[in-house]
Amino acid sequence: MIEFGVHSEVGKLRKVIVCRPGLAHSRLTPGNAAQLLYDDVLWVQQARTDHMDFCMKMESRGIKVLEFGQLLEETVRDKGARNWILDRRINENQVGVGMLNELRSWLDDMSAEQLAIYLIGGISVHELPFKPHGMFGNYLGGDGFVIPPLPNTQFPRDNSSWIYNGVTVNPMFWPARRPETLLVTAVYRFHPEFAPAFNNGDFKIWWGDPDLDHGPATAEGGDVMAWGNGSVLIGMGERTSPQAVGQIAKRLFEQGAATRVIACQMPRSRSAMHLDTVFSHCDRDVVTAFTDVCDEIQCYTLRPGDHAGQIDFRKEKKHLFQLAADCLGIKKLNVVQTGGDHYQKEREQWDDGNNVIALEPGVVVAYDRNTYTNTLLRKAGVEVITVSGAELGRGRGGGHCMTCPVWRDPVSY
């Protein structure tokens, strides 16, 4: 059995990637949090405890949970994989010329466990086994990072997107996140969990390459939903560009992987950075949505054209909710709106009330703090499993953001 492929948003979830908070989050400060795309610093110990609870609740449902730091450690045990990463991460463009050879030699000899910790957590000048020197070394000062930390690996949804029987490795919008794509690509290419299937053609990389400059064609997985029945929803807001959507659609159509892409043009805002921050699938016909944003989304339908490489494009008059229902072959969706009065709705959307992960049809994991929205979901027949979001949510992501499904069943309608 091929244990890869995501064929819906709510079918039985069987295998998922997560990334627990760690060293990168310990390096967050009030001074650098915004640059690293966090709104606040975390109580890291509590965040790790809450993340473990999240993982255990998925495992209790029979889901195989793969921790990204562990995957990376197991990947860099392979000398070829280690070289592949370091050739791209430790070069003149990244660390200058003065310390390049010493830094590379140190990392070449490092244990796989410590190297994986540093690749995600970053390396400060204090941790170097030699005195910083050269232009770059002196520029960093006493508290700079030779390799910046990657705290947003907590949200592995974004750096790659499994779409039916393949995956995109996404060129991300903000520089603070772009190295994530290199690391996840290495895992898919070299890790024993993935490499045999990749080499056998059991799954394909549809689009994206960390060796290429994609320019303004940026994409992040929080905008990408393998909706089912050959359809894909892709948000276009703060992080995912129309150039990327067009390229992804073209590759999917060329490979026969999808028959329709619904591009969803969203307002560009921090609170609605991805489609999944305002819209999540919870049950066969149930979604939760922040309608203040969803009602403003302009949708476009892309389909394969009559000739090779051609895409038919149509600006839609229908609402996102109706198009999503049409893709599933059902009359309409039961839309559970963000709960509470005007103020509470805005607060709960900000706290990821509409960013839930379905473990199977009608069962989701949500943050405990979003009591109004969770109550409405339960009234709609959805089982809501809660985890604490007080610390984990400080990076603006809920259960949907904190998971990258790699194997999920289809749903029949």
Swiss-Prot record:
The active site is at residue 401. Its EC number is 3.5.3.6. Gene3D superfamilies: Arginine deiminase, L-arginine/glycine Amidinotransferase, Chain A. GO terms for molecular function: arginine deiminase activity. It catalyses: L-arginine + H2O = L-citrulline + NH4(+). Pathway: Amino-acid degradation; L-arginine degradation via ADI pathway; carbamoyl phosphate from L-arginine: step 1/2. It is found in: Cytoplasm. One of its GO terms (biological process) is arginine catabolic process to ornithine. The keyword Transport does not apply. Keywords: Arginine metabolism, Cytoplasm, Hydrolase. GO terms for cellular component: cytoplasm. Pfam families: ADI. Belongs to the arginine deiminase family. This is Arginine deiminase. It comes from Marinomonas sp. (strain MWYL1).
